[in-house]
């Protein structure tokens, strides 16, 4: 594709040192540049792509997109924001692939992964070839690929959409993070349905305030319905029990479908009961009411099931197909996943890493724990420090014993992270011990557990690594827990 043809889709730019070369690839990492590439100079948290423009040209880049003129001997397209320009041009370069897909985006603090996986399983039950993008990874049909970010950079994202189209995928569900929305990674994505799960404290290290965090999530709904196509009606699916939905309701031009348990909503759950194998409830929708039994547990999962149901109804699936799929939904790896080696106590690994999700997970555990509840919990380094004492408070309040430990400390001193957590606990709040080494902490909790107890290992879920300093080491909470249980025999 000629550079000028590609740039015809881009507003607000000027070209320093003109030319119209053929563009055969798009790259933002100078190490991956090949002859004929258009290189994007993107500012990151630790490096600035502008510093690598010369290296990109040496490797064969025939044009550069940057936020200032550069001294290189190829055309430089100067834009206000390289990352947003990259998203727009990636969409154009790969032929606007989302215009040929039914695309559902799910945003919110908690529940994105489970909701997208439920939607995926409903679509499979309906016979669709499905694509999925999120925290656990990317799926194209029956193949899975590991994830780097919850929502990939736009070059990877649009390239993935193009691959999905080429392989006959017709239906895609994806997690949309606040970072991706704020950075414009999903510019050009043509969403058919946008889903809001909930909003609780997280990522304030990046957004600064809850208001800014809320606004970033709202960008998904602000762009929904801006491109009118009577053949592809758009829908916003909102959690009516979360007051933030009222804000998003006024941000979108799309029709709204609400779901909830407390407030009167379009899609509701009534008569919710815990069962030996999961939960049962009455699913009430504009298309009728059906009795649902599911293997999932916890009120938070009722919300996830309702969100997925509303999104699937908006996508044209029948209530009967949805109900059949919900009855057979498989748990998501690392989301309330049990470690069962025949022991007489329960071990659960969960991704809960916000104050709200820790509280919800422990409240759910309380519903079936016969004796004591232990929770192993840490907080990530180089992330929102203000949530650390709040997570510790939730842990000691809802567990009998909390074990504070490391999560992914990254560049921070693990002991300082633990001190930040301990600052949230006052005398008399509850019982906790501090064990910085995560493996030791897991082994301690499992070693203390007796018949009827529950051990909840929170924070990392499906992750198979731990980041300590610059090192990424193999670490899987599930594997460590399994080994610890076996050693008790």
UniProtKB/Swiss-Prot annotation:
A motif (Meso-diaminopimelate recognition motif) lies at residues 407-410. Its EC number is 6.3.2.13. GO terms for cellular component: cytoplasm. Gene3D superfamilies: Mur ligase, C-terminal domain (3.90.190.20), Mur-like, catalytic domain (3.40.1190.10), MurE/MurF, N-terminal domain (3.40.1390.10). GO terms for biological process: cell division; cell wall organization; peptidoglycan biosynthetic process; regulation of cell shape. It is found in: Cytoplasm. The keyword Cytoplasm applies. It is an enzyme of class 6 (ligase). Keywords: ATP-binding, Cell cycle, Cell division, Cell shape, Cell wall biogenesis/degradation, Cytoplasm, Ligase, Magnesium, Nucleotide-binding, Peptidoglycan synthesis. Meso-2,6-diaminopimelate binds at residues 383, 407-410, 459, 463. Its cofactor is Mg(2+). UDP-N-acetyl-alpha-D-muramoyl-L-alanyl-D-glutamate binds at residues 30, 149-151, 177, 183, 185. Carboxylation is probably crucial for Mg(2+) binding and, consequently, for the gamma-phosphate positioning of ATP. Belongs to the MurCDEF family. MurE subfamily. NCBIfam families: murE, PRK00139.1-2, PRK00139.1-4. PANTHER family: MUR LIGASE FAMILY MEMBER, UDP-N-ACETYLMURAMOYL-L-ALANYL-D-GLUTAMATE--2,6-DIAMINOPIMELATE LIGASE MURE HOMOLOG, CHLOROPLASTIC. This is UDP-N-acetylmuramoyl-L-alanyl-D-glutamate--2,6-diaminopimelate ligase. The lineage of its organism: Bacteria, Bacillati, Bacillota, Bacilli, Bacillales.
